[in-house]
Amino acid sequence: MTDSEHAGHDREDGELEDGEIDDAGFEETQDQEAKENEKQKNEKAYRKSRKKHKKEREKKKSKRRKHEKHKHNSPSGDDSSDYSLDSDVERMQSSRKKRTSSYRDYDVPFSQHRRISGSYMTSKKSQHNKKTNSKEYAESSFYSDDYFGNYSDDNFGNYSNQEGEEDFSSQLKYYRQSQESSGSSFSKESGKKLRSKGSPPGTEYRIKSFDVSHGHLLPKKIRRKEHCGARVIKGPYVFSGMDDFQEYSKPGKKWKVMTQEFINQHTVEHKGKQICKYFLEGRCIKGDHCKFNHDAELEKKKEVCKYYLQGYCTKGENCIYMHSEFPCKFYHSGAKCYQGDKCKFSHDDLTKETRKLLDKVLNADEELVNEDERELEELRKRGITPLPKPPPGVGLLPTPSEHFPFSDPEDDFETDLSDDMKKIPSLFEIVVKPTVDLAHKIGKKPPAFYNSTSPPGPQFEESSHCPQRMYSSESSPGPGSKVPQGCESPVRHPGSPGHHPCVGPPGPPMQENPSLLPSSSEIVGPHSQAGGLVQLDTLPSMGGAYHSPGFPGHSVKVPRESHSSPASLYQQMPSEMQRSADSESMQGSAEFYDDYYPQHAAHNFQPPDNSADEMWHEEFAQQQPPIARDTAHLGSGPNSSSRMTSHCPLSASGLPPAVQRALFIPLTQRYQEDEEPAGTQPHRASSKEEDDTANWYSSSEEEEGSGVKSILRTLQKQTGTLRNQQLPPTELSVPTDPRLAKEKRKRNQVVDPRLRTVPRQDIKKPHESVPVDLRLVWDPKKLRGNGGAPGGSSARGAEFDLRHTNAGANHKSKRREDDDEDSERELREKAFLIPLDSSPGIVLQDPRSQLRQFSHIKMDIILNKPNFAKHIVWAPEDLLPVPLPKPDPVSSINLPLPPLIADQRLNRLWNTKSDHQGALSLDPTSAAKAKLSLTHREGCLEQSGDLHSSGGKLGDPRLQKNFDPRLHRLPNTESHQVTAKDSHSSRSALPLARWNPALSQPSTAAPINVASVTPPLYAPKLSSEGLPPGTSSSVLSGISLYDPRDKGSLSATELSTISSGENTESQKKSGLKNSDKNQPSPGEVTVPQNTTADMEVPVDGPVDMQTDILRSADKVQVPAVHSLPIQALTGLLRPPYSDPRQAREPGQASPTPDEETDDKPLKEVFKTFDPTASPFC
């Protein structure tokens, strides 16, 4: 409110203002009426304007609050705080033009209006001016309250109310002058110009409030800046002086006009100054832009700065925690400080404060130690013995004691470089000390380089640490690419099992193409067998050994003919491989290693299918370390092999190939850097960048060569690659004998009998592989000797020499095995060492697993039985595993069928059986009968029919009780005289024996049960006991096709001869298998020791069976009863088949033991046990 309005309100009626004339009468009453009217009008307008501006003020306050929230924490500089002023200037000028008339009304000094406001001479114009003045000034006062309300205190409010209106006209004059002098361009400097002309202290606020009230001429940001331009100090004036105001209104400063309450809230009095309390607490985020004073020295907190302790504190000297002032605990506790003058902590004398700090630190250390001891005591109280603490200095990575020669690769592999390794090794040089088991494999004693425990990855043919130039061609044997012309180069190292003195004339390689690699047509045999290179019969297109001079004892053969161009092979490669390298290096191929991992290793791998071929090739090409490609580039021509040097006898490692690669890669890289020709530098430089993927200690999980996952992946890929490399040549070899297709499929199967039992449905082409010397291929000693050494021993390759004659054919390998089988195979291969020469006393895998593959080939196979097998005769009483069971009273109720019904049933059963003989795969008798001749079948049909009558169940106890127990007393020496007379017999019986995986063990002796050793079922003690009553099979088991006329058909001697050794074996196996179901009679159980004999003498069973069957069939020409019609048999078949379970005497608790009855004649046996037998027996 203006002073005039205050005066109008405060003045009583009739009270005169200064200078008014006290006239009475008519004029006074008129004047009073006019005054009242004016008062009412002014009050109404005042109320309206007040309401209007109150609403506007509230709106703007809410907007400003929102804006302040966003801008509060980010102190903005001058550039960001100034909005563009052009639009504001235009608005200001237009609004000024609108209001020029009202401004000019104020040209008359305002004091004059005030002086004459009460006189009669007051004109309507002056009254109107007074009204507008009061309105507009009220607006300005509201806006000033709006903008200063938060920061003004009572003094400021009083000041604005107490100031008189006498300066108002001068303010307007100054304002217009400043606008005109600046050429109507408003800027921040206008306020300074105005102030520099000596305006009184409150002038600027008047101008600002006026500007705000008339069209909001200033932008928000500028207004706020100008409003907050000075500090508020208690006293009659807001400003202490012009200088002070100008100092705080500089553009860089953002001082706000704050209330004392606000100041007290955010500052603390410190040494007589109001200091920003956040600064004193060390957490003022505004820094130099803070509104409050930071002029104080902070006391540091009595703690060491943890960031300084860790190495770097960003706050430096401004940090409120102690840095170098903190006392050094080593120096002050009496220990030696190894940092000396460079110590980060203070070595100054201790003060009271620093002594307290030091004591606190030392006590904390002691508390930690005491806490450990307390924990150990608690563990001991609970009965737990804590592990001893490791000695000091033992960390996660062991200190390297003996190292591989990273510093000087020229030295021997076994060289101890502890003197050279005094520098701290990098992570890539640290070699974890091996366990005791691996110590002899890593440099301690040099075993064969390619150990038989694990197939080395192909990268090691080239990345061995000896810097030998292995190739005499310019091309690189790229890891996954195809080799042209079927060239292989087995670069063997001097310590490997395949290393022998070179056999073959050295000669220059005949290369039609610079990318051809020298190939070998020789396979190196094991030390125990050959003693030198085993030269196999090679195809005419191959020949001519090339002896590389730098490798003493490395035989390399070169093809004499080239059947396809490298371009054709390049087109056959997978697209992934074609992208992986240039065309020249692509022509070196994975088949480069084919003879390096000889063909005999193919026994460990299943033939793969086509579908996975490209995948394996491409994966391996991506994963293979570039070392393989690099080393091949070392040679620049045929003469490059002469530059090969063999610095060291290579020590080998049985570690996984990924570990070997990680150990040998640094060495190979150095040799490549030293000896690489200049022409190959660009290629090597590019590939060296990829070598980091093979770093064993790399921390990147995404690199192929690092991490446990990639190591396992590498192992799987290497085994797949070995198979890749071995299989393509087998497909391209000459199809000489179509029967060998089956042999090839079986030859690639895994030797392990656990995997043998699963029949593989592998489909191979009939022209695949040609083993040239079958004696070498199928020698079981060699198979056994190398069975556990899948790719490591090159002795496996001594049995095959497979050459390509059509290298232009499509190189595709087949892959059927999944990763689980690969990992299992890796475990098997690394499980144990198998010596190269198999000692005679050691029993290895069942040789039948290999014989099954060769059953179609006529050849001599000599299998030795153990010495004790010929001299042991087992008595039945020696073989009783458990006491005999008591008879089942319920099952003895079953009565036999009348003869005619029984014979009809048997006849039907026999007819269906003979029709479906091959279908009963569970019955070993059917498997054997499928191979027997018709003569044998006619002679033995009676007995085999009995076995089939039980329903073909392998586990049926009655099937196991078909043997006369008296036969087992007789010596079984005759069976051993026929060791391997006819390979046809083994060929006919063994494949069927292996037909069903469940029968793999007892199958060899099973045919004898059927064909020759089935005594008549009327023998009472052979009946089944313990079966549930009423089963139909129990009735059928008692049915006998015995013909009384044929009593002499099989004498006891012949029966014993037939059944001697093999009968006991088969009975033992089948009887023990079913011993949980029924208690076997003494004749059923056999020699546990014969299992070894059975493992090694699979041929005896079939051979003895068939020779004895032939003998018995010649003597017994009487046909079986089944050849007669059923009606003709009615009078012939009397009850001799009667139910054996009723044969017991009433007082018998169990069947009579074998000892009592074995020596009695047949008649006495039947009279004793079978009261229903006919009188003539």
UniProtKB/Swiss-Prot annotation:
Pfam families per the UniProt record, alphabetical: zf-CCCH, zf-CCCH_9
Zinc finger (C3H1-type): 271-297, 299-326, 327-350
Phosphoserine found at: S1150
Keywords: Coiled coil, Metal-binding, Phosphoprotein, Repeat, Zinc, Zinc-finger
Gene3D superfamilies tied to this protein: Pneumovirus matrix protein 2 (M2), zinc-binding domain, Zinc finger, CCCH-type
GO molecular function: RNA binding; zinc ion binding
UniProt keyword Nuclease present: no
Biased composition, class Polar residues, residue ranges: 512-522, 564-587, 713-728, 1050-1064, 1077-1093
Entry superkingdom: Eukaryota
Comp. bias intervals (Low complexity): 179-188, 493-502
Skewed-composition ranges (Basic residues): 47-73
UniProt-annotated stretches for the region Disordered: 1-137, 179-206, 383-416, 446-587, 622-654, 670-767, 780-826, 942-988, 1043-1101, 1132-1162
Bias kind Acidic residues: ranges: 13-31
Coiled coil: 27-73, 347-383
BP GO terms, sorted: negative regulation of DNA-templated transcription
Biased composition (Basic and acidic residues): 1-12, 32-46, 753-767, 955-967
Protein name (database record): Zinc finger CCCH domain-containing protein 6
Species of the source: Mus musculus
Gene: Zc3h6
